[in-house]
């Protein structure tokens, strides 16, 4: 099987930077596994690399759809596999980098997702319930039918909560059972996993600084522009981190300082959930950034590890 490198880790840990450094040395191209970077017009709040930061390395699954378009895990897997084959056909190394756990799992475990199970009426009804009764009410509904899925899916991830309820309603089988059964499928490629970790307080400090930098770069203007384009609170992408908080400020629901503090807090919580998710993945070669005083030393460490798979940096 062909090698595919996968770089995982919490938000603000430096996945993209490491992926670019490896791609430059190993003749690679990068596939983003980030559920927010797929959206056009949302650049600052999703921390997309700009052209200068990409350093000439081709990136896939960035700016794939507009903010009001549906983009499922099944669609991610389909496109990611297509781009992996495309990169391999050029004799290059595919590098998947991102922090969306379900996207990563869909590839490394070759999970099967049925997009054919779809009930628009039920979906609209559940969306309305979430608006009227709150996210927690809907999450409790999921808890009753699929406690395992409820444990993994955050109550604010309304889209995934609804999807899990929808699958159970149609199949009478919890989505967690579907996922466990589909894990028996052999993976399509030899996925080599590298994980980035660091001291929690250092990571939280990086997150706080990243949010401040987003504000400096013009996050408020970016959200204002999206609102002008017709994207509002009901748009799926606008419920993402960095957008819902600034939107609440623009709607006069809280001050900018409050919105920023909530964004920092919720991003830290998200990073914690990401690490909990990634720690459950087996055969990850973990890089603790605290043990290295430069990126060059991290590359040197990886050089010996990746050489065992025939990947030379």
UniProtKB/Swiss-Prot annotation:
Assigned EC number: 2.5.1.75
Site (Interaction with substrate tRNA): 100, 123
Superkingdom in the source lineage: Bacteria
Keywords: ATP-binding, Magnesium, Nucleotide-binding, Transferase, tRNA processing
Classification via SUPFAM superfamilies: P-loop containing nucleoside triphosphate hydrolases
Reaction catalysis annotation: adenosine(37) in tRNA + dimethylallyl diphosphate = N(6)-dimethylallyladenosine(37) in tRNA + diphosphate
Region ranges (Interaction with substrate tRNA): 34-37
InterPro entries found in the cross-reference section: Dimethylallyltransferase, IPT, P-loop_NTPase
Binding site for substrate: 11-16
PANTHER family: TRNA DIMETHYLALLYLTRANSFERASE
Known partners and oligomeric status: Monomer.
Protein name, per record: tRNA dimethylallyltransferase
Gene designation: miaA
């Amino acid at each position: 099987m062909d090698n595919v490198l996968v770089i995982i880790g919490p938000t603000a840990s430096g996945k993209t930077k490491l992926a670019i450094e490896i791609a430059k040395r190993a003749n690679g191209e990068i596939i983003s596994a980030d559920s927010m970077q797929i959206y056009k017009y949302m650049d600052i709040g999703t921390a997309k690399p700009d052209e200068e930061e990409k350093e000439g390395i081709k990136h896939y699954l960035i700016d794939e759809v507009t903010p009001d378009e549906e983009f499922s895990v099944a669609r991610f897997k389909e496109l990611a596999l297509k781009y992996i084959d495309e990169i391999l056909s050029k004799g290059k190394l595919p590098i998947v980098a991102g922090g969306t756990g379900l996207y990563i799992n869909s590839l490394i475990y070759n999970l099967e997702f049925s997009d054919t199970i779809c009930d628009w009426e039920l979906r609209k009804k559940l969306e309305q319930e979430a608006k009227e009764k709150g996210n927690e009410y809907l999450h409790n509904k999921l808890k009753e039918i699929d406690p395992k899925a409820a444990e993994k899916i955050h109550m604010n991830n309304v889209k995934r909560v609804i999807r899990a309820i929808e699958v159970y309603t149609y199949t009478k089988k919890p989505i967690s059972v579907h996922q466990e059964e589909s894990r028996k499928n052999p993976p399509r490629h030899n996925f080599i996993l590298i994980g980035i970790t660091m001291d929690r307080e250092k990571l939280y400090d990086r997150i706080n600084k990243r949010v401040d930098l987003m504000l400096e770069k013009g996050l408020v203007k970016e959200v204002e522009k999206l609102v002008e384009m017709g994207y509002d609170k009901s748009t799926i992408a606008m419920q993402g981190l960095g957008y819902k908080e600034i939107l609440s400020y623009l709607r006069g629901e809280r001050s900018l300082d409050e919105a920023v503090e909530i964004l920092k807090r919720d991003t830290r919580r998200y990073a914690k959930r990401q690490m909990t998710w990634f720690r459950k993945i087996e055969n990850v070669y973990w890089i603790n950034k605290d043990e290295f005083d430069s990126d060059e030393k991290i590359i040197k460490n990886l050089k010996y590890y990746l050489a065992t798979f025939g990947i030379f940096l």
